[in-house]
Every structure is written in C-alpha cells, then in structure tokens.
Amino acid sequence: MKIGIFYRTDYVVPAKEVYEKLKSHFDILFFKDSSENFPEVVDDKTFEPQAVISVGGDGTVLRVLKKVKCPVIGVKAGRLGFFSGYLLSEIDKLIEDLKNWNFVEDKRWILRVESQVGVFFAINDAVLQKDVSQKIVDFTVEMTDGTFYYHADGLVVSTPTGSSAYALALGGPIILPNVEAFEITPMAPQFLATRSLVIPSTEKIKITVSDMVSLVVDGDVVGKVKEVYVRKCSKVITLLRPKSYDFSTSIKEKIGYGKMLLKNGSE
C-alpha cells in the first residue's frame, strides 16, 4: 500500500517516530512538512497515495486535506484533534487498520468562495472581518428567500464541519455533519436579536460589504474584499476514522457538549 506522511514543522520528532513504525509495512511515498507546497502530490497520478497521514493538530489536517485527493488520517499531536482519529500512542492500531482498511469513511462537503481576489475552498469556514481600526461594517446577504442585513464586526459562513469551530464560539448552533445546510453567524452584531442563520446547502449567497474587509478562509487571510459569493462545492473531503468513531462522542470528549454529569459533578 502506498501512503504519504505530512507533519507540522514543530512535530517533526513524533512524525519521524510514526514514519519509522510505518516504513516496514507500507510504501512511504513522501514525508513532508505540511507548510510547504508540493503540487506533484496532487497532480502526478502515478505518485498519488492511497491514504495520507497527517501528524499535528486540526490546522495541519486542514492544510493536508487541501493538498491531496485521497483520504486523510489524522494523528493527534496538537490540542483538540477534531479531525484526528488516532493518538501517537495508537500507531500499532493504525497499522493494523491500514492493512485491513478497517475505517469509517467520514465524508464532508465544503464551500466554494468566489471573490475579486480569487476562488477558495473552505472546509471549516469563510470569515469576513473588519480591521481593528475600522468602524462597524454593514453586510448585505442576498439569497432566494430574501435579503438580510447585518451591522457587525464580521460574518462567519461555516459548513457543518466548521459549525463546531469559530461559529460555535460566537454562539452559533452545532450542525451535524450529515445535515445539508450551512450557517451565517455575525461577529459582535449591533443588535442583540441578530443570531445565526441556517441556510439550505442548495443556496448560493451573495455578500456585499459597505467597506473593504479581510477574507479569511480556514484561518488563512487571503485578501481584502467587498463582495463574495458562497455556495456548496461539488468536491468532498474524506477523513478515515477508526470503526469506533461517532460524532456525538467526539464533541463530548473535545468540547464537553452534551455530557451527562452525575450528582457529584463527575461524568
């Protein structure tokens, strides 16, 4: 089996340990820093692995998912590890699961974001955000069901995957991964009644801003814009999870959502 390994720069030591364990079992096509560009990984079909392992945190997995077409396996070396199915201490289990292809294929759809600075693909979210020195900004959101106006510091447009990230911290709802919808969540809105809006994934929305703001896609600032179009992309990404994976357990463990507490306060 052909596999590749990407790692975050400051996790090269544990990544090398993963490499040493895997190399006697699989054909390792590459072992590379995820912050660098390697277009041949995507473009050269003869070089394409059957799976790629990402050693790092959620940010590393996000970068890797955008580099490759094949499924990605996250090995947690960071903090939360929403995208990670394995710990560094579980590499032996990962080897067996790879040999038997014993995984849950967790497929997630993403957003296509069109703007004057380019076309981008958001796995978690696309954020329109004013600068610190700017006054409050007016956002106009046009869709099939009408036009909505927001007076806020910014807007977060998130996928179901991203609904448990930045949007959740802003008070937005968690959208289950299999729900065909995305959400718009305002940042520091002027009116307290302004809350998240959940939109069918069939919608294509146009967002117009009263002043130039930063467009941030999955945490990366890509430029200044006044207008963007957002819709569901035809592409999907695939994460390989252990057979024991389920979403409800993940959000309980990672962020404490929906945990049951006993009378003494313990879980």
Predicted regions and their residues:
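Gly/Ser-rich helix-loop-strand patches that form or flank binding pockets
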Residues: K66-G78
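Glycine-rich phosphate-binding loop
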Residues: S54-G59, L155
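Catalytic core of DAGKc-family lipid kinases
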Residues: G78-D153
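ATP/NTP phosphate-donor binding region
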Residues: M1-A51, V55, R63-K67, L87-D106, ...
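Gly/Ser/Thr-rich active-site loops/lids in small-molecule metabolic enzymes
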Residues: A152-A193
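Short Gly/Thr/Asp-enriched flexible loops that form oxyanion-binding sites at enzyme active sites
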Residues: T60, V64-V68, A167-G171
